[in-house]
From Swiss-Prot:
Major subcellular site: virion
Gene name of the record: PB2
Localization, UniProt: Virion; Host nucleus; Host mitochondrion
Site features described as Mammalian adaptation, chain residue numbers: 627
UniProt protein name: Polymerase basic protein 2
Source domain of life: Viruses
GO molecular function, one term: RNA-directed RNA polymerase activity
Motif mapping: Nuclear localization signal: 736-739
A single GO BP: symbiont-mediated suppression of host gene expression
Family stated for the protein in its record: Belongs to the influenza viruses PB2 family.
């Protein structure tokens, strides 16, 4: 107070005012503050007083030859005075206007290429549709979101190497372009940017936008894909939202979405196979998404979703340290606990063995449609503050938190037996049993939980067992809040381990993820997902299994043919025939298999009875464990299109139709490809069965005596030549090889040479 009086007193004297307003500033500290360092201390002020001057801009001397001294209105564009401290001229802002209107025009061809991200954005906004504005309370939670649509997914280092290679190809420095995407992008950009006059630094900045994913931790209510984030300022305020439908797609959002679908399908399929982990890896390595290998996408894409993270863990990549339960992502924010096995009794007196977490802990729970803060002690929920889009979402979050708390009243609320199984028909672990039980019906759980009187707290309301809000009462410890809970912001990743059954644990042994946590939601992928693994043939139903099985045989016919004659058992056990078995009626599988195997054996024994079409057609049936019986079949049944359809043992049928003239195979009316070899020639298989270890020299030669039979051939010495009878009476000259060669090359060259010899 005293100081203020003193200052008022000083200001009332006229001399003080004059000193303060008129004298120059010569205090060293002040001069230092505004002159030291390159950083402008008051940019807007500086800009204002610079622009108030007549010639605030400096330009290269050459400008005087390119711009007239005065414009059409007679205003001076540049001063004859040169800039103090440099050999540049002082120029008026009017010169810029003149240049923009009358200056030289360079080629604009590179602009859309360099500024691609901007041009694309304009297109998206032009074709996007903005709907009505709604006024309502917005529950925003901070999430880590992708802020530049249309980018590739290179790491910062990879992008840096690409940019250096494209923009500054002659600069010294080690650049290693290894990944396929790096090489493709580099080649593409070098071609696009030939003779580009835009400043290299600008090109580098723009390339970075195109190549690297940039994420920010932003408050969002609604869509989180980059196409929605770029219009965040137009679609949601504090108390309003505007509907928006993006115009067009951007590849990065499509990749994220398709990756999640592929990962879910793969994890679900792997979980039911004999060795889930091996199967999962095999599928990840043989799947492509939009033409890019899935494993390459997994290495670069930071998407955090349960199935995606299981695939990453299997590949030995680091993942987020948060764990998943009931479809929510939990992150411990404080406290600690130790785990102990405990046996508990359900309301139905069934014993459950659960791993109890002893100790006080706090967690954030983040789901797609609801978020919460959970505070719990040993087997006790202390507090749950939940917020969500609607009643249903809030109820789901409450159920998950109640189960997570492991409270006794929750376990006692179980009515009936718990015997839920996963896709592989294995019993779920107790915590997931409870979760599934209450997801079906949580009435008893909510009724038994208990109710308490509540104090009114700003922004919070109570919730009753029937999910109606109340300001007086609430389920014990549970409140609904207007404010959302932010997602965990840290991007730190941890080393994890994964077991055979796809359970992912951190280094302390806590389970972070398991196949039970993978969402059952089905979606349609935006990019084409190509699963090359036979395990995924079932994904599109029985027809796809049928087509894929036969396509596989046709594509690999050369190898299949040799195995058929040399090592049939190995061929019958191939995993590619596994999916097919589900199409064959269970009761008769064994008989079919026995019948087909016997038929094949006769074909091997009796020369000239090899029939390509028939082998291809019947091979998948031979894969089941055979039952010996004297039964003969003229047709075999497969279950497709909801009923049994017949495949004729001899001849074509709607299921399996082979056109000998075009060599095209049609399965259920769909094209299944072309056989590269003519099955009409009965020689086609014999040569592979017989002529392994022999080189075909050409047509038969009388000087080498009469044609030998197949059996006599085996007596030849290495290097010895002989005529041999093959197929339907054709004679060729062969020589026994001097060294053993691969089965494959022998039979492939045999096929070609026999044709040449015969024709």
């Amino acid at each position: 107070m005293e100081r203020i009086k003193e200052l008022r007193n000083l200001m009332s004297q006229s001399r003080t005012r004059e000193i303060l307003t008129k004298t120059t500033v010569d205090h060293m500290a002040i001069i230092k503050k505004y002159t030291s360092g390159r950083q402008e201390k008051n940019p807007s002020l500086r800009m204002k007083w610079m622009m108030a001057m007549k010639y605030p801009i400096t330009a290269d001397k050459r400008i005087t030859e390119m711009i007239p001294e005065r414009n059409e209105q007679g205003q001076t564009l540049w001063s004859k005075m040169s800039d103090a401290g440099s050999d540049r001229v002082m120029v008026s802002p009017l010169a810029v206007t003149w240049w923009n209107r009358n200056g030289p025009v360079t080629s604009t061809v590179h602009y859309p290429k360099v500024y691609k991200t901007y041009f694309d954005k304009v297109e998206r906004l032009k074709h996007g549709t903005f709907g009505p504005v709604h006024f309502r309370n917005q529950v925003k939670i901070r999430r880590r979101v992708d802020i530049n649509p249309g980018h590739a997914d290179l790491s910062a280092k990879e992008a840096q190497d690409v940019i250096m290679e494209v923009v500054f190809p002659n600069e010294v420095g080690a650049r290693i372009l290894t990944s396929e995407s790096q090489l493709t992008i580099t080649k593409e950009k070098k071609e696009e940017l030939q003779d580009c006059k835009i400043s290299p630094l600008m090109v580098a900045y723009m390339l970075e936008r195109e190549l690297v994913r940039k994420t920010r931790f932003l408050p969002v209510a609604g869509g989180t894909s980059s196409m929605y984030i770029e219009v965040l300022h137009l679609t949601q305020g504090t108390c309003w939202e505007q509907m928006y439908t993006p115009g067009g797609e951007v590849r990065n959002d499509d990749v994220d979405q398709s990756l999640i679908i592929a990962a879910r399908n793969i994890v679900r399929r792997a979980a039911v196979s004999a060795d889930p982990l091996a199967s999962l890896l095999e599928m990840c390595h043989s799947t492509q998404i939009g033409g890019t290998r899935m494993v390459d996408i997994l290495r670069q894409n930071p998407t955090e979703e349960q199935a995606v993270d299981i695939c990453k863990a299997a590949m030995g990549l680091r993942i987020s340290s948060s764990f998943s339960f009931g479809g929510f992502t939990f992150k411990r924010t404080s406290g600690s606990s130790i785990k102990r096995e405990e046996e508990v009794l359900t309301g139905n007196l069934q014993t459950l063995k659960i791993r109890v977490h002893e100790g006080y802990e706090e967690f954030t729970m983040v789901g797609k449609r609801a978020t919460a803060i959970v505070r719990k002690a040993t087997r006790r929920l202390v507090q749950l503050i939940v917020s969500g889009r609607d009643e249903q979402s809030i109820a789901e979050a409450i159920i998950v938190a109640m189960v997570f708390s492991q409270e006794d009243c929750m376990i006692k609320a179980v009515r009936g037996d718990l015997n839920f199984v996963n896709r592989a028909n294995q019993r779920l672990n107790p915590m997931h049993q409870l979760l599934r039980h209450f997801h079906k019906d949580a009435k008893v759980l909510f009724q038994n939980w208990g109710i308490e009187h509540i104090d009114s707290v700003m922004g919070m309301v109570g919730v009753l067992p029937d999910m109606t809000p109340s300001t007086e009462m609430s389920m014990r410890g549970i409140r609904v809040s207007k404010m959302g809970v932010d997602e965990y912001s840290s991007t730190e990743k941890v080393v994890v381990s994964i077991d055979r059954f796809l359970r992912v644990r951190d280094q302390r042994g806590n389970v972070l993820l398991s196949p039970e946590e993978v969402s059952e939601t089905q979606g349609t992928e935006r990019l084409t997902i190509t699963y090359s693994s036979s395990m995924m043939w079932e994904i599109n139903g029985p027809e796809s299994v049928l087509v894929n099985t036969y396509q596989w045989i046709i594509r690999n016919w050369e190898t299949v043919k040799i195995q058929w004659s040399q090592n049939p058992t190995m061929l019958y056990n191939k995993m590619e025939f596994e999916p097919f078995q589900s199409l064959v009626p269970k009761a008769i599988r064994g008989q079919y298999s026995g019948f087909v195997r016997t038929l094949f054996q006769q074909m091997r024994d009796v020369l000239g009875t090899f029939d390509t079409t028939q082998i291809i057609k019947l091979l998948p049936f031979a894969a089941a464990p055979p039952k010996q019986s004297r039964m003969q079949f003229s047709s075999l049944t497969v279950n497709v299109r909801g009923s049994g359809m017949r495949i004729l043992v001899r001849g074509n049928s709607p299921v399996f139709n082979y056109n000998k003239t075009t060599k095209r195979l049609t399965i259920l009316g769909k094209d299944a490809g072309t056989l590269i070899e003519d099955p009409d020639e009965s020689t086609s298989g014999v040569e592979s069965a017989v002529l392994r270890g022999f080189l075909i020299l050409g047509k038969g030669d009388r000087r080498y005596g009469p044609a030998l039979s197949i059996n006599e051939l085996s007596n030849l010495a290495k290097g010895e030549k002989a005529n041999v009878l093959i197929g339907q009476g054709d004679v060729v000259l062969v020589m026994k090889r001097k060294r053993d060669s691969s089965i494959l090359t022998d039979s492939q060259t045999a096929t070609k040479r026999i044709r040449m010899a015969i024709n």
